[in-house]
Design a protein with these regions (language model features):
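Extended amphipathic alpha-helical scaffold segments
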Residues: 106-114, 118-123
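Charge-rich interaction surfaces and accessory domains that mediate macromolecular binding and assembly
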Residues: 2-105, 120, 135, 174-243
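Glycine-rich phosphate/pyrophosphate-binding loops
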Residues: 126-140
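Catalytic micro-motifs at enzyme active sites that drive phosphoryl/nucleotidyl and oxygen chemistry
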Residues: 87-94, 118, 145-156
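Short glycine-rich or small-residue beta-strand-to-loop segments that form or flank ligand, phosphate
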Residues: 101-108, 163-169
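A short acidic, glycine/proline-enriched capping/turn motif at secondary-structure boundaries
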Residues: 111-113, 137-139, 173
Length: 243
C-alpha cells in the first residue's frame, strides 16, 4: 500500500482517529494494483473523509472500497459540464461486489442545493436513503473530460466537482431503475439552471443595494434605508440558505 501523502495526512488529521482507522481499513481492502494505485488510495481517503464512523463501521471495508472505485471508474470521462448519473444494483461478476440496496452515483459541478434536490427526488419515488457519501473533490480533466488527477496540487487548474453516492431501497424493476435515472438527470439539470439564475439575481440585488448608497433616488432617507435593509435581509437569507 502506498504511504499517505502530505495532503492525505493534513486531511486525515482533521477528523477523529476512529474514523481515520476505519478509512485506512477501506484503503487496505482496495488493493487495486497497477500504476494508478496511489491515485486510488488518495481518492479513497478523500472520498470517505466526511462519512460518520457508525456508517463506515456498519459496512464491510471491501464493499465500501469497491463502491467508491466504481464511482471513480464511472467518473473517468465527463464531457463538458454535463452531470453524470448511474442507478444500478451491484453484481459480483460485473462490479466485484454486491449490496442489498440499489446504488446511485452522480458526478456534477459543485453547486448549492444538490443533496436536498436529490433527496426530494427519492422522496417522490418513496425510496428511503440508507447511506450518503458526498465529497467535493478537486478534479483535473483534459479538454475531452478525461480524468487526469485529483487534488488541489495535481498540476494545472482544478475544478470542484460533487461526487455523490447513495444507498437506497432496492429497486428491482428495470423500468423503474431507468425512470429513476431520468428523474435524477432532470433534477441535476434543474439545479444547474436554478443556481445560475439564483446567482444572477443575487448580483442584481447587490447592484441595487450599491446604487442606493451611491446614487440614491428622490426619496426620503428613511424610505431609502428601509428598502436597503430589506434587500440586505433578502441577500443574507439567500446566502445562509446555501452555507
Amino acid at each position: 500500500m502506498h504511504a499517505a501523502t502530505a495532503d492525505d495526512n493534513r486531511l486525515l488529521h482533521s477528523i477523529p482517529a476512529a474514523r481515520v482507522a476505519l478509512i485506512e481499513r477501506i484503503v487496505r481492502s482496495a488493493a487495486t494494483g497497477g500504476g494508478r494505485q496511489g491515485l486510488a488510495q488518495r481518492f479513497l481517503r478523500s472520498y470517505f473523509h466526511g462519512v460518520a464512523e457508525e456508517d463506515l463501521a456498519a459496512r464491510e471495508p471491501r464493499g465500501l472500497s469497491r463502491a467508491a472505485l466504481a464511482h471513480l471508474k464511472f467518473a473517468a470521462q465527463r464531457p463538458g459540464q454535463h452531470p453524470l448519473v448511474r442507478v444500478f444494483n451491484p453484481q459480483a461478476e460485473r462490479d466485484g461486489f454486491e449490496s442489498p440496496h440499489t446504488l446511485v452515483l452522480t458526478v456534477s459541478d459543485d453547486m448549492p442545493f444538490l443533496v436536498d434536490s436529490i433527496g426530494m427526488a427519492f422522496a417522490r419515488a418513496n425510496l428511503a436513503v440508507h447511506l450518503i457519501v458526498h465529497p467535493v473533490l478537486q478534479v483535473h480533466r483534459d479538454r475531452r473530460g478525461r480524468l487526469l488527477d485529483l487534488g488541489a496540487n495535481g498540476g494545472g487548474p482544478a475544478r470542484a466537482e460533487s461526487w455523490q453516492l447513495y444507498e437506497i431501497d432496492r429497486v428491482t424493476d428495470p423500468q423503474e431503475l431507468e425512470k429513476l435515472q431520468r428523474d435524477l438527470e432532470a433534477t441535476l439539470g434543474d439545479v444547474r439552471v436554478a443556481v445560475h439564475d439564483w446567482r444572477a439575481m443575487r448580483e442584481r440585488v447587490r447592484a441595487v443595494i450599491d446604487s442606493l448608497a451611491k446614487d440614491p433616488p428622490a426619496l426620503l432617507p428613511a424610505e431609502i434605508n428601509e428598502v436597503a435593509h430589506l434587500l440586505e435581509w433578502m441577500d443574507e437569507g439567500d446566502r445562509k440558505s446555501v452555507v
